[in-house]
From Swiss-Prot:
Upper classification of the organism: Bacteria, Bacillati, Bacillota, Bacilli, Bacillales
Protein name, per record: Uracil phosphoribosyltransferase
Notes on activation and inhibition: Allosterically activated by GTP.
Cofactor: Mg(2+)
Task performed by this protein: Catalyzes the conversion of uracil and 5-phospho-alpha-D-ribose 1-diphosphate (PRPP) to UMP and diphosphate.
Cofactor note (record): Binds 1 Mg(2+) ion per subunit. The magnesium is bound as Mg-PRPP.
Organism: Bacillus velezensis (strain DSM 23117 / BGSC 10A6 / LMG 26770 / FZB42) (Bacillus amyloliquefaciens subsp. plantarum)
EC number: 2.4.2.9
GO terms for MF: GTP binding; magnesium ion binding; uracil phosphoribosyltransferase activity
Gene3D superfamilies reported in the protein's UniProt record: 3.40.50.2020
């Protein structure tokens, strides 16, 4: 079973408070999401393997370390997931970026794939699927389905806030995927919104309320 990691770093929690605040405007909201995504990327890459290399400093030759053999990919779920990409790329600029687009079928209410673009070397990469919210879990499950159908083998999921129902749904369908969360909230309400949550992340990122 994949593990669930909830980041309690003070900076993440501090910034998340302002992300939640309904009075935070679009620009500040976007900047804060970018910053938290960067901090979370620092945590999620903590276990990357290292190898020793020789480097010549201005003083002498030294043995130092670099990341070994890991090809990373970031896959935002459109559109809200885009708000997390730049913050992650600040720390891992060599990562390739794919995209998964989903829409909700008006009759079945289930997510339907409408766009997928991934790096050509899918099988060689470890992917981090990102979306600010993990509510019902339907979009995350379908996005990871899309990656696995195309050959992805190593996948993680990262979000700002999650409901227990969404975590359970994702674990039920993809028990091999680790989940990284800034905050695990109380529940979903009758409309499927995370409580207390942060509202509609896409609308708040792009000013389309």
């Amino acid at each position: 079973m994949g593990k669930v990691y909830v980041f309690d770093h003070p900076l993440i929690q501090h910034k998340l408070t302002y992300i939640r605040n309904e009075n935070t405007g679009t620009k500040d909201f976007r900047d804060l999401v970018d910053e938290v995504a960067s901090l979370m990327a620092f945590e999620i890459t903590r276990d990357l393997p290292l190898k020793e290399v020789e480097v010549k400093t201005p003083v002498q030759t030294a043995t130092s370390k670099v990341i070994s053999g890991k090809k990373l990919g970031i896959v935002p779920i459109l559109r809200a997931g885009l708000g997390m990409v730049d913050g992650m790329l600040k720390l891992i600029p060599a990562a390739k970026v794919g995209h998964v687009g989903l829409y909700r079928d008006p009759e079945t209410l289930k997510p339907v794939e409408y766009y997928v673009k991934l790096p050509s070397d899918v099988e060689e990469r470890e992917f981090i699927v990102v979306d600010p919210m993990l509510a019902t879990g339907g979009s995350a499950v379908e996005a990871i389905n899309s990656l696995k159908k195309r050959g992805a083998r190593n996948i993680r999921f990262m979000c700002l806030v999650a409901a227990p129902e969404g975590v359970e749904e994702l674990q039920k369908h993809h028990s091999d995927v680790d989940i990284y969360i800034a905050a695990l909230d109380e529940k979903l309400n009758e409309k499927g919104y995370i409580v207390p949550g942060l509202g509609d992340a896409g609308d708040r990122l792009y000013g389309t309320k």
